[in-house]
Amino acid sequence: MDTEAGQIELELFEADAPNTVANFVKLAKDGFYDGLAFHRVIPGFMAQGGCPNSRDGAKGMPGTGGPGYNIDCEINGQKHQAGTLAMAHAGRNTGGSQFYICYEAQPHLDGVHTVFGLTGNMDVVKKLSNGSRINKVSIQDS
């Protein structure tokens, strides 16, 4: 993930959350995330992005948009720790495109949100602020 703050590497947990990972990969390959902002950044908690209403010129309020459909939660044994990549939602099975990266462990979110990856480059993640842009999300097969 190329951001204004720098590159953030993502390891996706396809075995733990296959549908969530497939959705994220599809959106990334379609360019959905390109130009979006991290619209909710709370130091010590998390940085949230992926809302199309954070795009320049969008009419909706940032944090309220999605891809036009919902995906089911895939709760798994992965824990919310520093660097966790998880799907945001407004209630069970209402996720779509918004995701967040944890700055540190958030055990109260375990079993509530789908953890579908882990980030590297936490030094870059910690540089994110409200409004930091995602330039492009590129997918590389391992």
Spell out what each predicted region is.
Residues 1-142:
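Cyclophilin-like peptidyl-prolyl cis-trans isomerases
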